[in-house]
Amino acid sequence: MTNNTRGYIQLHPFHLVGPSPWPMFTSFSLMNLALSLGLTAHGYMNNNMFMLLSTMTVLYSMTLWFKDIMAESTYLGDHTVAVKRGLMQGFLMFVVSEMLMFSSLFWAFLHSALNPTVEMGMSWPPAGMEAISAAELPLLNTMILLASGVTMTYAHHALMNGNRQNTLYGFAYSTLLMVLFVMFQGLEYTYAGFTITDGVYGSTFFALTGLHGLHMMMLIMMLAMCTMRVYNYDFTNTSHVGAETTILYLHVLDVMWLFMYMIVYWWGA
């Protein structure tokens, strides 16, 4: 939380964060979201109001948390060189953990695809399962993600050169492309001929693509935040840790989607 009190001489370059309610508030909001999602999926709740309310509280708490972090970094000067280095290292560790999580799901998919059992009809996809064509919406989403990589690289180069207007355009276009991707992914789910309960194919397919979709939603929030910060002159060509982590996150998710397209949609279908 933002802390304006400086009653001591700090003899180290690190930021000692003051008490903040947002980690606890976000944790309880995420717990409520998970519970409401599970209860709704299993038919214990007849409407989505509690799930929508939990989603709103998660977004609200994360917005205020980000607001405090931006105030500490931009206006209070708490993010020294050592703090920025630690933030980048922590984000890299987060990216590695995400790659390991996706690797486990790819392992589950390939384990069943390379050795289909009798119960699946000795074939992959299982007998009677109509897979989604790789030449339809998945191909369009792949083109959208590749285009977002181009616009993001354009924004990064503009930011490094101190060109605020082109940086703003690059982040705005990237945000729009990510929103289109999530919309088309939802449309694909709507018209899919199977669900997450349709055996190992449905569960691994929706686990992989759904997890990627959740990360894309988080990326949209990060891109929107970066767009707002560029608009408010918060970034400079030498200090833009938030932009660097967002750019790295987008490229990592792009690579994950390319593997997903080749393995799940093209080869796996």
Curated annotation (Swiss-Prot):
E.C. number: 7.1.1.9
UniProt membrane topology term: Multi-pass membrane protein
PROSITE patterns: COX3
Single annotated GO MF: cytochrome-c oxidase activity
Key words, A-Z: Membrane, Mitochondrion, Mitochondrion inner membrane, Translocase, Transmembrane, Transmembrane helix
SUPFAM superfamilies: Cytochrome c oxidase subunit III-like
InterPro entries registered for this protein in UniProt: Cyt_c/ubiquinol_Oxase_su3, Cyt_c_oxase_su3_dom, Cyt_c_oxidase-like_su3, Cyt_c_oxidase_su3-like_sf, Cyt_c_oxidase_su3_a-hlx
Catalytic activity: 4 Fe(II)-[cytochrome c] + O2 + 8 H(+)(in) = 4 Fe(III)-[cytochrome c] + 2 H2O + 4 H(+)(out)
Chief location of this protein within or outside the cell: mitochondrion
Pfam hit, one: COX3
Gene Ontology BP, a term: mitochondrial electron transport, cytochrome c to oxygen
Subcellular location: Mitochondrion inner membrane
Membrane-spanning parts: 21-41, 49-69, 90-110, 132-152, 167-187, 205-225, 247-267
GO cellular component, one term: mitochondrial inner membrane
Top enzyme category: translocase
Family membership: Belongs to the cytochrome c oxidase subunit 3 family.
Role this protein plays: Component of the cytochrome c oxidase, the last enzyme in the mitochondrial electron transport chain which drives oxidative phosphorylation. The respiratory chain contains 3 multisubunit complexes succinate dehydrogenase (complex II, CII), ubiquinol-cytochrome c oxidoreductase (cytochrome b-c1 complex, complex III, CIII) and cytochrome c oxidase (complex IV, CIV), that cooperate to transfer electrons derived from NADH and succinate to molecular oxygen, creating an electrochemical gradient over the inner membrane that drives transmembrane transport and the ATP synthase.
Self-association state and partner proteins as the record states: Component of the cytochrome c oxidase (complex IV, CIV), a multisubunit enzyme composed of a catalytic core of 3 subunits and several supernumerary subunits. The complex exists as a monomer or a dimer and forms supercomplexes (SCs) in the inner mitochondrial membrane with ubiquinol-cytochrome c oxidoreductase (cytochrome b-c1 complex, complex III, CIII).
Protein's recorded name: Cytochrome c oxidase subunit 3
Organism per entry: Debaryomyces hansenii (strain ATCC 36239 / CBS 767 / BCRC 21394 / JCM 1990 / NBRC 0083 / IGC 2968) (Yeast)
